[in-house]
Amino acid sequence: MQIKPIITYSGSCPLFRSLESQILNAIPLDTCEWRRTFQRPTKHVRLEAQAQQFNVAALEKYKQGDWSILEHPILHIFVTECNDVDTYKATIREAIDIWLKTLTSYGVSDWMILLVETLDMRKTKNFMPRTTVLDKIRLDFGTKNDDRCISVLNPAKFEQKSTESFRCLVQRIRFLMLTSYNRNIVKYEELIRSKREKRNIEGWDFRQYFFMQEDLALIFEKLELPTEALIQYDELDAMFSQFITHTGLNEKQQWLNHFRKPLDAFHGICLTRADKFEMRNKIRDEGVSLLEFRNYLFERQAYLLLTCNDIPEIAKRLLNFLFSTLREVELIKLECQEGALCCWEFVCALEVLQLCEQAMEPNELTCFQHCAPIWNLAKDKLYELGKLCGLLPGCTPTSEQLHIVVQLSSGIGDAPSEQHQFLQATPQLRDRSPNRKPKKSGAEQLKEALGSNQAFQKLYLELAELAISTYKHVTRLRSARLVGLDLGNFYCALNEPHKAVGFFTDLLRELKAENWHMLSSQTLLELANCYRKMGDSLAYTKTCSSISCCAELETLVRTFYFDEFLKSLKTLKTTLSAQPSIENANYCVLEDHFRILDIEVVNQKPIIQDDYILVQLKVESLYPRGVVAENVKLCYELEASSLELAMENVSLTASPSTVKAKDTSSRLKVSLQLVYKQDNRLHSAAVACDLPKSKQPVRRTSSTKRKLSPSVQADFTNFVQAENIALQPGVNLIEMKAKATRVGCWQFKQLCISMSSLEFLSEQLPFMPATFEISTKPASATLEFKTLIAGIVQPISLNVSGGSFIFPPDAKITLRCSKNLRIRQARNTDDEAAYNDDQSFESTLQVPLVQFKSFEERRIPLEVLTDMPGRKVSKHHEHHIALNCPWSRTELPIAVDFQPAMEATCRLHTCGTQKFLQVIMKGMEAHLLLQHAQVKCDVPGVQLLDLNPESQQPIEIYKSLTVTYLYEIQVEPLKTEHELPVVKVHFVIKYASLSQPDVWRTYGCAFDLVDYTTLFKLQAQLEPNELCRLRTVCNMNLKITKVHENPYTDLMYEVLNDQNLWAVCGRSAGVVSMKDVDSHSISLDVMPLSTGFLPMPSIRLSKYTAGGKSKTDGHSKVHPFPPGQVYNSTKSMQIHVIASVAGDQ
Amino acid sequence: MAFCIAVIGKDNAPLYLTTSDMEQELELQYHVNAALDVVEEKCLIGKGAPESKELYLGLLYSTENHKIYGFVTNTRVKFIVVIDSSNVALRENEVRAIFRNLHLLYTDAICNPFYIPGESLTSKKFDRAVQKLMSGTA
């Protein structure tokens, strides 16, 4: 159907017909600017036209409102050839007036008056007329429309001269046509709107309305406005859907019965029809089914979108078109054959997909986004048809199904004849390669697929692959994997489970990664089915184990697969021995089956080397029933602190902060490798994996089936384990233990549970477990004692701690004492005789360690005894005991300090020429009994008199208590100090401790008596003798008398006064000479400062050596006399001082 | 009114998923899972452009029987609603209202101080309210 605007002609019709072909051919040669109304953008359009003779019938339709914009003339032309003014006035003017009034009466204002001129007539007349016919016409009719009156030279006679004139005519015709269209389109839209508003009135027919609006769309399409045309079709589409949706609301739409035809024919859309309006004629004349009508609508819309070069929009609209049409078919309850709609959907999908394949950039990606679900839909519909016709794998079509195939094939129909120029007419599409044969249409492909099982499978697999690849291309990976799920099921039905496993595994991996547990469970069920068919018992076992641990599945399903798991677990060993490949890993992810809740080291005391590590593991089993684990291992590794320390010491180029930032919970055990040059300079540093080569620490993450296996296996050199553990559903407490063999700070890394020959390896532990330390406990021997006292038996204790040392049967410890120190093993106090015998102490003691075992601790009580020192050498008496232990080659010296039990001092007292010896015993730490104190002197001529009372009972002393003994020393007068300068006396006393009152030991102390002869005698006397008054000067007479001959001639006396008691007036010291006299008197003045009985002022007598005799000794020296050589007879005399009376002064 | 309402976390893990028809639960879960592709696609488009304020993503995709709509919060939590295709009376603004109410319910649920973000939504009050929302009585 040609859609061309209609131009009517009137007047000199033969003349116009002679010009018609030239005019109509010239109109499409150029574009014309179209200034549209309502602020729409200006557009350049290319027009075509057809000519008809003026007819009032069309105008009559226009007047009644029953007109179509396709059939309505858009321009009326009156043609005349009159060149004579008089002839114009006589006949032509009247004809034009009648014609114009006719147009005006019908409301048409689109007209043009064309005057064809002939130059010959001008040449014959030699004068110029005053007015031309054109001027007359414009004066009469074109008062306001000068542009509608135009003259043109006749091109039939003057081809060369009339070119410019003719071009102006054609341009004017184009302009007036477009102006007419502006007015007509607006009027036509108003007509359509009024028709639409009457759609609820009885008798209204959608089909008539449809053709009206489609006419407008066709005009828009003709005017190169495909977008505007598309809007018209979209409005028709929406209105039709709305009518069908609300068809139950009222029964007035009788026209719907025209679409209620049975769907005997269900061919899909065809975008390459030779005759685009074939279906339109059918709609008008015969009536079509709903499906055919919908197909026509979509074809028109697709064609317009193709004109806009918007192929992705076609793909975008397809699914909505298919789904909404299906709903409409259901709503109006059309009868159709089973599978017919599937065929229709399939053919429609393939039609659009073939069109999209030819799309070019930049529409390609957007087109693919919309194509992917269309491929999926085609695959799904083909599957439904295969199920219906018995074409699925493993099925054979029955005769009834074959009949269905025949009926469906006839319903699909033949492909309409294609317009091959279509592809050439649209240069936006990609050209096909000449070598590629043209693709079959969707209908042909479907018929071929329904014809045989092999063809069906081939097409189905092809469509599925295309869907997956297209989804992946537009990065819709989840949708791609769902298509893979369908394809995997199809391969299972084809008995090719090895191809299906890849799809299921991909889907499972993604679902598990995003925690879609329910969908993961379903995929595991599919995988188990595949592995069972494949005979892969290892994978089947692992999958059954995973299924039985899925909480989302029903208990019956879990129990069934748990039984399958146990059954195949028994046969797994045989299978694994037959396939010793490393790729066939027997590892599972532990977290799928168990949940690690807690790991606790339960050793109370520090773990010693060769001791046992006790670990309590809390694990939750996800199995539905109990399962026996042959082995449960938990490996531990050294902490990385040592490596960090080593790396910090190396001068690397990296900064120390970078080194310290190293993660201490590294999953791989790595070590530092340093490469040095020959001159010991560092060449390079590297970090290498420190594992035996026989083990593979890292495995390649395969893209098919091994992705779900743990990727890293820790080093299981050191582990704690438990064997034959029954794991019940829920929380299990497992006691694990192992021998601690290596020393260091350890950290748990990985848990491994073994069943038969299947190992469940955990990923990283869910929490940071506490570290534990294994240390070596060395054997040790120590001496334990409190404050030790010399002179009495003291208890000590030998503590032997075995540690990890293995003792020989005859092991013993040798204790060797220093000089004067003796030791023995502690005796039983019941055996008093042996206890009191000091002969049992020895300087060397061997302590046998009878049957001493490792980690045993034994306490051996001992006793030590040492003599008290005779002199006060130091505060502590030091001894040491050397231990010789079987676990050490060197002796271990232990210092032992003793305090003396008591100490003795002596003083020499003088009374005139008599000498007395005082011995003072002072108790220290011990509680002792004393008796039989004696002083002996072996020097002849010296006699000691014991002045102490006779005592029968021993004297008891303890800390801070003193006992004093007094003896008189008498020296024969014939013996002078010159002959006996030193008198040596020995003090001997017997003592016993309170704990051993019957054991008496002797304590001896020697004293040396020197300077014991009295040389001088001091006497002091105060005057007045009895009454000294306060603050009154008294006279003190000091008399020094030589008692014994001595070499000292010069003496110095000093008054040592107390500042609060006495004040010395005048000289307080002086030097006297005793060279030739036996006595010397000195008079001193003293004054008392206090009342009461005051002691006599102290006087010190010293030896004086003058210092002026030699040059080297320039200072005098004063040496006090020892107390034995000076006797002060008035030392303890007291003076009564009374208060002074003011009147006496 | 709705066949399925799902709340998906920002790591695409399902936090809450309920269906009105138990027999179709598996199929609806697959639909929700596939809808995440389209959600990511729309969010990715908005990544280059200035951040869009529109949380409602509109129709994600359609099947023969269902229409799947999406909504994404500022914290990248996704709401997916699956609606019956034959329910032509349901307007788009009504779908927006469903999402708006669902967003309010979700914010109320996660205001619980004992709720750990990222965990499944197990609030009974939330479940009852969503059931009402799904049946169209909310």
From Swiss-Prot, chain A:
Signal peptide: none
Chief location category: Golgi
InterPro entries with a match to the protein in the record: Ig_TRAPPC10 (IPR056917), TRAPP_II_complex_TRAPPC10_C (IPR022233), TRAPPC10/Trs130 (IPR045126), TRAPPC10/Trs130_N (IPR056913)
Gene Ontology biological process terms, A to Z: early endosome to Golgi transport; Golgi vesicle transport; intra-Golgi vesicle-mediated transport
Tissue expression from the record: Co-expressed with Shal in the nervous system.
GO cellular component: cytosol; dendrite; Golgi apparatus; perikaryon; TRAPP complex; TRAPPII protein complex
Compartments it resides in: Golgi apparatus, cis-Golgi network; Cell projection, Dendrite; Perikaryon
Pfam families from the UniProt entry: Ig_TRAPPC10 (PF23604), TRAPPC10 (PF12584), TRAPPC10_1st (PF23036)
Highest taxon, organism lineage: Eukaryota
Keywords, ordered alphabetically: Cell projection, ER-Golgi transport, Golgi apparatus, Transport
PANTHER family the UniProt entry points to: EPILEPSY HOLOPROSENCEPHALY CANDIDATE 1/TMEM1 (PTHR13251), TRAFFICKING PROTEIN PARTICLE COMPLEX SUBUNIT 10 (PTHR13251:SF3)
Recorded family membership: Belongs to the TMEM1 family.
Self-association state and partner proteins as the record states: Part of the multisubunit TRAPP (transport protein particle) complex. Interacts with Shal (via C-terminal dendritic targeting motif).
Record function comment: May play a role in vesicular transport from endoplasmic reticulum to Golgi. Has a role in one of the several mechanisms underlying dendritic localization of Shal channels.
UniProt-recorded name of the protein: Trafficking protein particle complex subunit 10
